[in-house]
Amino acid sequence: MTARHRVKRALILTWLVMLAPLPSQAAKGSACAMTHATIARDEAGIRETMAAYNAALNGGKTAAVLPLYTEDGVFMPPYSQSAIGKSAVAAAYDKVFEELHFDVKFTIAELVVMAPNWAYVRTNSAGTTFHRSLGKKLAEANQELFVFKKGDDGKWRIGRYTFSPTNPPSK
């Protein structure tokens, strides 16, 4: 074996050792633990949470929305400061539901499990909102971004949520 082949072989072995997962990395919570089966289960769990959020939003109950957020969840509506943590998120949704009654449907445009405990979902929603202060129903359409975090109990919850309207402003 020539010196060139020995160097090449040593480099290949070095790369293999560097890329091989350590036993601790193959445990729960590592990228190495992600398989097609676990990703499929995770996607199903995220879709379940999205459906629950859609129902909770249309139901207008903060108590139904809150369990879908992580303890450190952040709600970032347009033209408002971020609501950080469950108590702030609860206060923000109380205000939203005080003014608006939703009849919307979310459509998932993109769902990506990025790591064993993190995923994002890009959605579009459309329907109507009844504005109590105006006494009228208006068309509603938004694009949304959800960042999900899997809890120790295996449930996927909303860690971050923001949206922007896609309808032009009312005149």
Q: What are the language-model segments listed below?
A:
Residues 53, 65-66, 73, 85, ...:
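Hydrophobic pocket/interface hotspot
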